[in-house]
């Protein structure tokens, strides 16, 4: 979660173990640990988020959040595929939301995999240039 939070290609990280989480203080008082599931928003759209997930090699893509293997899902396409973007937004599900259940793999390997997958997607500056070019 800390690695993702510092990345410019991640807009937001949802994990109660982070000091930046709005309920971190409550979680610290009530929990003995913060769990192995982290959700985050990729800085991009539905397609960019899918590209990020496709570039990962460690986690399996799937809706389950419990097991020894790392599992990841693009929430809009796996859990809310039958809803339109507008319907998903109405319940707070953005197209760039990712849910990642961390397994027993080596943490350094997981971070390296996240790093290479993030490196493979365009940054905000490049996306802004593309958008400006298409508007002209």
Feature roles, as predicted:
Residues 1, 50, 85:
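Short glycine-/small-residue-rich flexible loop motifs, especially phosphate/cofactor-binding loops
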Residues 1-13:
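Short acidic amphipathic segments
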Residues 8-10, 34-35, 94-96:
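Short coil/turn connectors at secondary-structure junctions
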Residues 9-12, 64, 112, 126:
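Short linear functional motifs in flexible/disordered or boundary regions
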Residues 12-80, 130-134:
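Conserved PLP-binding catalytic core of the aspartate aminotransferase-like
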Residues 54, 70-136:
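PLP-dependent enzyme catalytic core of the Aspartate aminotransferase-like
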